[in-house]
Amino acid sequence: PAATGIAGSYARFGLHDQFLYTVDNFMLRTWSLQNPTCPSRRDSLYVGWNIETIFPWKDRLFVGSQTGVFIFNNTNPARPVQEAVFNHATGCDPVVCDENNAYVTIHGGTNCNGTFNQLDVIDIKNLPNASLSKSYPMTKPMGLSVTNEHLFLCDDGLKIFDKSDPLNMVQLSHLKNMTTYDVIAFSDEHLMVIGDGGFYQFDVSNP
């Protein structure tokens, strides 16, 4: 199977197979890396306004904007095709996903002009009919990452949830004495967090 790169939820670029995907405020661009020293642009798609993040997952690209999540099918990695759109309340919104759900944080108090602070769980099992399953109120959620068992969330520090039942997630831990922005879970045991003080690594084998 094609390899997908690992990146944070605030990333504006992502890797899949031999292609690089980048987003700016309006566009999704596809670059061939067959010659890694000289990437060549293969495709450009207008997505919408205020595009912020991109998260590759298997044969799909999840693009976050201030008003929603755009889902692209990249079965043909050189030519992604929009498959679904999920609209949400205005706010800054990184997005990650697993096999059945996308997880989106929305936070206000920034230049995104939002007032909501929540974690949305979006059912993506039946695309293109993505639908909101549940919203969890939060303080000011930012970056997030998921593994098979856990959801890691930058919100008033770092929160760790058991997500085995996404509609009834259980908070397992809350580390408050740090300012965090994004998180990357390499496994259910190894975590990297980006915050005011730089990069932090955690052993979360016992969350």
What are the roles of these predicted feature ranges?
Residues 1-207:
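Feature marking well-ordered beta-strand scaffolds used for ligand recognition
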